[in-house]
């Protein structure tokens, strides 16, 4: 049994959670997050989050997921805006693999990130039998090693606009307008808590500041995740999973330079980077950036038999069917060339632990990670991979 109490909350169509926390970057922050499911369509969802800090910083995030435009075309969007006062940024050589944390710039930043996603589902695997609702099954068959027979295969077109403005004229304002093409095969048995299968995504990106008088920069990214069930462990763990993730990226246009040594490169906030919510998790977002990167993650995920959350007042108002303990390690590095020997030399690392739980159908993760430079605590939604 995952729930220790007979008094369980029924999963609701909407839920809102206030929060209060303090970090060195943001200061003392207060905010609220909310999710609404089945808005206009049963498989669709809205998610929003906003916070304000005593440093006069703010973050706003709004997203809409999985709205069916046709029987095989889904639409999603994400809108992000943040004003970060006296925040750390790693500009220019400050973001190289050999750079030091002491070289960071503490400045005021204004960030924007807006994107639309049009996802076309190929008539293979579960889509062939169940249509687009097949991708929302809580459990899926992942026993076949071919996208024709198993999983969800999709092609996504993702227009995006991003910008970053920093104070004190440390760097010029940077803007990127572009488009991504993503080829995705999701062959996991579950998207919220996978125990077996795999997930592979190949992404091509291209962009420019204006698309008028500038050359177009381009990037290639490949990510592959694998999951292996270890079964239960006596009366301690109901479920054990080993999860592995591999990521690599390159910017082919990086060394395409003119006579004035102006090169066709993305702005720094769009460069291949490590650090943040998904890779090298003990480092701030964009800590390392450059032309190329390679990164490996390994996680040991445990679902304990002991589940006290359903019997705790206030908390048991929310639907909490499971919680998960996680130990993880990340290693990776960026480089100014795509060379496997270079990318596997002097790699950066992170180790950490996390508690994850499903709240009203959304996976929430709280994790602490430590690296050679710093330690970070974060709370975010969704599994990292």
Question: Model-derived features: where do they sit?
Answer:
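Outer-membrane beta-barrel biogenesis signature
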Residues: 5-14, 128-149, 310-320
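Outer-membrane beta-barrel translocator/channel fold
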Residues: 50-121, 235-277, 287, 342, ...
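Transmembrane beta-strands of outer-membrane beta-barrel proteins
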Residues: 16, 44-48, 73-79, 153-157, ...
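Transmembrane beta-strand segments of outer-membrane beta-barrel domains in Gram-negative
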Residues: 80, 86-243, 335
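Outer-membrane beta-barrel "beta-signal"
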Residues: 120, 181, 353-359, 374-385
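Outer-membrane beta-barrel initiation region
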Residues: 5-78, 85-89, 104, 150-158, ...
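Outer-membrane beta-barrel pore domains and translocons
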Residues: 21-23, 51-53, 78-82, 121, ...
